[in-house]
Design a protein with these regions (language model features):
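Phosphate-binding/switch loop-helix module in NTP-utilizing enzymes
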Residues: 1-24
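Non-catalytic, compositionally simple segments
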Residues: 21-168
C-alpha cells in the first residue's frame, strides 16, 4: 500500500486542510476519513517519513483533532487569541458602540472609544500574530462573523455557543 517513486518512498507527506464541513458532518464520514488516514496515508512512507498535517479543527471528533491527541505525533495547536482581555466591561461597552446600527459612524465611534481606552482594553491580551491580526481586529471578526466561526476558524475550538448544552 506504500507509495514510492522508483525505489524511494516519500520522506515527507503534507496534508493541508483535507477536512471540510461536509466530510466531518456525520460519524460515518469521519470514520471513513480516519480509516483512509490510518490505512493509506500513515502507511505510504517508511520509518523516516514525516507527516505534516495543517488544518482547522472543524469537529471534536475530526481526524485533525484525533491526530492532535495521538501520542504517536508531535502536535502543535495554534489560537489567534492566546489570552483574553482582563477588562471585559470596556469591551462590552465597545461592542455596544460597534454594533449600534442606528449610528452611521458606529465603526469610527467604536474605534475612537478603543483608542481612548486602549491601554486598559489590551491589559492581559496576547495574540498569535499581532502584525496580521491585532486583538482589536480579532474582536471585530468575533462580533461581525459570530462566535461559532471565530472559535472554529481562529481559535481551533469548534464550540458553537448557540448549540452548546452548557454555555462555556
Amino acid at each position: 500500500r506504500g507509495r514510492r517513486h522508483r525505489n524511494w518512498r516519500p520522506d515527507l507527506i503534507v496534508l493541508d486542510d483535507i477536512e471540510n464541513d461536509e466530510n466531518v458532518n456525520t460519524p460515518e464520514q469521519r470514520r471513513k476519513l480516519k480509516s483512509w488516514f490510518e490505512k493509506a496515508v500513515s502507511k505510504a512512507g517508511d520509518t523516516y517519513t514525516d507527516i505534516m498535517y495543517i488544518g482547522t479543527i472543524l469537529h471534536y471528533d475530526s481526524l485533525l483533532n484525533n491526530v492532535l491527541q495521538n501520542p504517536r505525533y508531535k502536535a502543535k495547536k495554534y489560537r489567534a487569541v492566546i489570552s483574553e482581555a482582563v477588562n471585559t466591561k470596556l469591551w462590552d461597552e465597545w461592542e455596544s458602540i460597534y454594533t449600534n446600527l442606528f449610528d452611521e459612524d458606529h465603526e469610527a465611534h467604536a474605534r475612537k472609544f478603543y483608542e481612548e481606552h486602549e491601554a486598559d482594553m489590551l491589559l492581559g491580551t496576547e495574540v498569535l500574530w499581532e502584525e496580521k491580526l491585532s486583538y482589536y481586529d480579532l474582536m471585530e471578526v468575533k462580533i461581525s462573523e459570530g462566535e461559532a466561526s471565530f472559535n472554529s476558524e481562529l481559535q481551533n475550538d469548534p464550540i458553537d455557543p448557540d448549540n452548546a448544552t452548557f454555555n462555556p
